[in-house]
Amino acid sequence: AAKEVLDIQIRAGILIPTDGEVRRENYIHYHCRHLAGFDFNKLEHRVLRDGAYETDLPAIRGKVLTSGKSYSAHDYLASQAVSSQPVKFTLPGPLTIMDTTADCFYDDRPKLNADLADTINKEVLALVDAGCKYIQVDEPLFARAVKDALDFGMEGLERCFHGVPKSVTRIVHMCCGYPDHLDDHDYKKANPSSYHDLSKSIDEADFDQVSIEDKHCCNDLNLLEKFQYKTVIFGSLAIASSRLETTEEIVERLKAALNHIDRDRLVVAPDCGLGLLPTQLAEDKLRVMCKAAALI
C-alpha cells in the first residue's frame, strides 16, 4: 500500500513524498499505541476542535513513556526501500496528541506536553539513525490554541527535534483543520489569523521549515514577510474539496507569494494530507500542482 501511495506521488512529480500514513489507523493514536500510560480499552467522551466534533478518546492513566522498539524507523525503512525519492516521515506533535486524547492523570498541561515531546524525540532520533533526511511534526492544534502554543507548545516542538543534526530537515506542519468528508463548507476551521500571532515564535524556533495552508484559507500574503529565517511550505491544493484546481490559478497565487518571500525559501505542497480524496482525483491535483510549480 505504501508503494502504491509513493508511486502516485512520484508519478505526479512530487520530489519529497510521504508514505501516506497507510499503516496507521489514526495519525495520532498510532503513536500513542506504542507508549506506556495510554488506555485504549476504557475510552473517555470528549468534545474536540472548538466543538467541531465529539468522540470517544483513549485515556492517559499513567506517566507517558516509550515502551519497546521504535516503530518509526521500521516504517520509514520499509517505505524508503520502495521509493526512488527521499521519503519524508511525519509524526503527531505533543499539543495535538493532547487534544485528541483524554488526560486522566497529569492535570498539568506543560508537563504532559514535555513528556509527549520526549517520546516523539525518541522516534525522531531513531529516524535520523535510519537515514531519514526529512522529518515533520504535525501541530494543527497551534492554530486553535495559540496561547498554549506560545506558553509551552513551541518549547515542546523544539524538544521533539533535540539532538537532530543540521543534515536533517526539521519541519513543522500547522493547518487549520478539516472535516471528515469532502465539500463540507460548514466545518468550523481554526482562524488563519493565528498564523500571524504565531509567526514571530515560529520564525525564531529551532527547526527549519513551517508548513501552512493557503488554498483553503487564502492568507494575507504579508504573513510571508514575517518569516525571515524559515522556509515556508505553502499549501496550494484544497485537500477537502472535490474541485480540481487549474494550473493557472496555482501559478497566479505562487507568483503573488513570491512578492513577499525569497524564491529559495518557498516550497509548494498541498494544504494537508490527501486522505479525503479519491485516488485519481488526488493524483490529478498533485499533477496540476507540480506542473504549476515547474512553470514558476
Model-inferred region functions:
Residues 1-296:
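Domain-level signal for soluble alpha/beta catalytic cores
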